[in-house]
Amino acid sequence: MHRNDSQRLGKPGGAPESLQMANNNFLSTLSPEHCRPLAGECMNKLKCGAAEAEIMNLPERVGTFSAIPALGGISLPPGVIVMTALHSPAAASAAVTDSAFQIANLADCPQNNSSGAGGNPAKKKRKRCGVCVPCKRLINCGVCSSCRNRKTGHQICKFRKCEELKKKPGTSLEVRGDDSFFPCLASSLIPPFSPPFQCFLSPFKMHHSFSESPSRL
């Protein structure tokens, strides 16, 4: 009996060899090279199933989706909000609140800028005309208060101050009668006009005071 058993075990075509071949075939199908893709697919399926379950349970954890504003109006990317909602409902609600606050601030900014622009209009700086006698004067008198306080004051000489700048900003520019025709001549040197022409110039004529003449300097 012992000899027959040993012969059976030692035979090349016996049962032990067939079992060994079956085991080898089974192990070859489950080799690491074949197991890695199968394991990756299994893990992917498990992750997808877990993600679908979390998404299905998301309304119960966070609330209804109606409380979340449209994804186009949120400053944060939609994926960030969804991932935050999956991990922490409180953080998701805080992110949604923060996004709504940012949207409200952006909506208020143009209104504030427009109100500020309407309340403080830019003032237009007036310029010298360059035609009147004070504008043509090139030398300061050195006697008036503006010239005496040149180190502390910032006003121009009184004899060089433009006639247009002396007027109030609301008044319109008036047309000068005699000076418009003879800007370089004094009023005493202008010849008298005929009565009809004087009647025509009377509404536009301006009376300039030459009391402070350059001869006094």
Swiss-Prot record:
PROSITE patterns the record matches: ZF_CXXC
GO biological process, one term: Wnt signaling pathway
Keywords: Cytoplasm, DNA-binding, Metal-binding, Wnt signaling pathway, Zinc, Zinc-finger
Keyword Metal-binding: yes
Pfam family membership, one: zf-CXXC
Amino acids binding Zn(2+) 1: 129, 132, 135, 162
Molecular-function GO terms, alphabetical: methyl-CpG binding; zinc ion binding
Gene Ontology CC terms, in alphabetical order: cytoplasm; nucleus
Zinc finger residue extent: CXXC-type: 122-163
Primary location recorded for the protein, binned into one broad class: cytoplasm
Disulfide feature: none
Subcellular location as annotated: Cytoplasm
Binding locations of Zn(2+) 2: 141, 144, 147, 157
Positions of the UniProt region annotated as Disordered: 1-20
The organism's place on the tree of life at top rank: Eukaryota
Domain-level remarks: The CXXC zinc finger mediates binding to CpG-DNA.
Function: Acts as a negative regulator of the Wnt signaling pathway required for anterior neural structure formation. Ectopic expression induces ventralization. Binds preferentially to DNA containing cytidine-phosphate-guanosine (CpG) dinucleotides over CpH (H=A, T, and C), hemimethylated-CpG and hemimethylated-hydroxymethyl-CpG.
Designated name of the protein: CXXC-type zinc finger protein 4
Organism: Xenopus laevis (African clawed frog)
Lineage per the UniProt record: Eukaryota, Metazoa, Chordata, Craniata, Vertebrata
Gene assigned in the entry: cxxc4
